[in-house]
């Protein structure tokens, strides 16, 4: 969908509907991707956000019903090339992925993708010094939140909540179970009802996050997801028709 090719760029408050591909941080470091809506609508090849390079921050995004996997997962971390040429893939380092909501995606999180044509995958460089924290993941039945996890990766998981999925394997440290969000907003977001106890209070792993996808926070703490239920009306919404300019 978008291929970033330089450093320090920001992608925010966009709505992607049934788009084949991903928002890919292809070249460049220290980019921010936040406050975006990705609606796959069950269309083949729809993806989310792919990380390549150093120092990226991906937060407060809503990703739902995406049918892509591997490099077109909802959120994926690319394997890097040793001594990568400018046209290659640089190792993912120091990324923070936090406060995202991932709903009913074929492949929610994939860590260590893109090794199909590598010849010897063991020579590729895994993501290191990364954090995945305070994300809410509602999995499809029988599918785990981590669709792929390169065993060499250095990624710390903290405060993530997972609904549904599979009982075949226990959740890793840094992920625990929760109830699935069941209410639908006018623009198509699945969320917890106001009467439902809010998801757990977030850990302090992304101190740079001061608002949420709908607008400024309505309290002194953050919930584990891209939004926060409160009495404060949101100021941002996903586009709901081709002529809307609310985002």
Write out the residue ranges for each language-model feature.
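Surface beta-loop-beta hairpin patches that serve as ligand-binding interfaces in beta-rich domains
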Residues: 171-247
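Glycine- and acidic/polar-rich repeat regions and solenoidal domains
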Residues: 1-179
């Amino acid at each position: 969908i978008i291929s970033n090719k330089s450093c320090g760029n920001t992608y925010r408050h966009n709505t992607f509907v049934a788009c084949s591909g991903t928002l890919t941080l292809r070249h460049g470091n220290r980019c921010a991707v936040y406050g975006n809506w990705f609606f796959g609508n069950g269309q083949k090849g729809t993806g989310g956000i792919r990380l390549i390079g150093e120092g990226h921050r991906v937060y407060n995004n809503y990703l739902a019903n995406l049918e892509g996997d591997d490099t077109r997962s909802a959120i994926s971390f690319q394997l890097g090339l040793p001594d990568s040429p400018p046209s290659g893939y640089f190792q993912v380092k120091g990324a923070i992925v936090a406060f995202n909501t991932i709903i009913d995606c074929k492949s929610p999180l994939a860590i260590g993708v893109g090794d199909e044509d590598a010849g010897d995958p063991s020579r590729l460089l895994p993501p290191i010094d990364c954090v995945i924290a305070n994300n809410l993941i509602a999995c499809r039945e029988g599918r785990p939140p981590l669709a792929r996890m390169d065993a060499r990766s250095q990624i710390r998981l903290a405060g993530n909540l997972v609904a549904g999925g599979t009982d075949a394997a226990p959740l890793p440290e840094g992920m625990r179970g929760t109830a699935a969000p069941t209410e639908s907003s006018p623009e198509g977001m699945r969320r917890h009802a106001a009467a439902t106890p809010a998801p757990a209070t977030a850990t302090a792993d992304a101190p740079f996050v001061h608002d949420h996808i709908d607008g400024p926070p309505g309290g002194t703490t953050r919930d584990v997801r891209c939004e926060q239920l409160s009495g404060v009306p949101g100021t941002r919404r996903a586009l709901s028709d081709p002529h809307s300019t609310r985002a």
